[in-house]
Amino acid sequence: MKDCSNGCSAECTGEGGSKEVVGTFKAKDLIVTPATILKEKPDPNNLVFGTVFTDHMLTVEWSSEFGWEKPHIKPLQNLSLHPGSSALHYAVELFEGLKAFRGVDNKIRLFQPNLNMDRMYRSAVRATLPVFDKEELLECIQQLVKLDQEWVPYSTSASLYIRPTFIGTEPSLGVKKPTKALLFVLLSPVGPYFSSGTFNPVSLWANPKYVRAWKGGTGDCKMGGNYGSSLFAQCEAVDNGCQQVLWLYGEDHQITEVGTMNLFLYWINEDGEEELATPPLDGIILPGVTRRCILDLAHQWGEFKVSERYLTMDDLTTALEGNRVREMFGSGTACVVCPVSDILYKGETIHIPTMENGPKLASRILSKLTDIQYGREESDWTIVLS
């Protein structure tokens, strides 16, 4: 019995073949097959999020018998999967999302990619998918971006979205850890996440009959099942005239996340302190990369209290009655920072005075982050592709 490095033990004897079991793939073994026909690049001003893809993709196959195969950059193509693949039946899969930016100096930067690799690794363990060397995967991703670098928009309002994905591919209807898997990476040039544009406020629909995640579940992992199961509530939010779902949890209606974003409240708290608050990472909150950066920035500024704490709808409505709420905004890789203007809760529309207050803090955070992403400000939060 041998530990296959995927969070539990499994038979990994290599019977039936003489190949050595490979514990991780290596970027130095990368096989590159360039596309012979390159597609026309889109206008960066007319990009619809996630609908256009670049010329190439990265794939790495794994099996419990032989371990990792060599990584391969190849022309973008459809996958060939057995219809019994575990990802198709039992959602044995995960994904990540990060971006490459073309800076004002024409250099291409990745923003905090190590945090994405860390989160992807944790999600793989939770999904019983094989683990990998995070630095090797990141190097392979960098090589993919370099090959498709002309797809990184020449624009400071667009970027190249990077979508690593990891799926179980074993052809079996048994509910079990897969013995075969495929890791692949897609690239997509993107503009603003919301059709309303960058930094326009969104309205939220809060209904406690739906929950996004629960204690002991997978809400802190970036798994497709967390998103697919949210679509019904999202459709209901739209039917009620709102753009996103404000996910509540528990009998006290704790505020957790907004759609695909983490949530921040900038207010005067119960003790009369100026505070930036966001829900804690207790297992039901996705540990967002942008969330982490916002907390780090706020701590560096040292101008107000910064807290990871529980917030309820009663806390919010009481604060609004006392004119103690300044701003509410979501954060995420796709949107960066997104102001909140209204919440539909218990049949009533609650107005959040985010835009009336500037929003000074949300605007400041957005400006700081985008300055770093587009190279207007040097920072160790980015990796410059050489």
Curated annotation (Swiss-Prot):
Keywords: Acetylation, Amino-acid biosynthesis, Aminotransferase, Branched-chain amino acid biosynthesis, Cytoplasm, Lipid metabolism, Pyridoxal phosphate, Transferase. GO terms for biological process: branched-chain amino acid biosynthetic process; branched-chain amino acid catabolic process; G1/S transition of mitotic cell cycle; L-leucine biosynthetic process; L-valine biosynthetic process; lipid metabolic process. Coiled coil: none annotated. It is an enzyme of class 2 (transferase). It holds the Pfam family Aminotran_4. This is Branched-chain-amino-acid aminotransferase, cytosolic. The modification N6-(pyridoxal phosphate)lysine is found at residue 222. The lineage of its organism: Eukaryota, Metazoa, Chordata, Craniata, Vertebrata. It comes from Homo sapiens (Human). Homodimer. The modification N-acetylmethionine is found at residue 1. Its EC number is 2.6.1.42. GO terms for molecular function: branched-chain-amino-acid transaminase activity; L-isoleucine-2-oxoglutarate transaminase activity; L-leucine-2-oxoglutarate transaminase activity; L-valine-2-oxoglutarate transaminase activity. It is found in: Cytoplasm. Gene3D superfamilies: 3.30.470.10, D-amino Acid Aminotransferase, subunit A, domain 2 (3.20.10.10). The keyword Lipid metabolism applies. Its main location: cytoplasm. The keyword Transferase applies. GO terms for cellular component: cytoplasm; cytosol; mitochondrion. Belongs to the class-IV pyridoxal-phosphate-dependent aminotransferase family. The gene is BCAT1. It catalyses: L-leucine + 2-oxoglutarate = 4-methyl-2-oxopentanoate + L-glutamate; L-isoleucine + 2-oxoglutarate = (S)-3-methyl-2-oxopentanoate + L-glutamate; L-valine + 2-oxoglutarate = 3-methyl-2-oxobutanoate + L-glutamate.
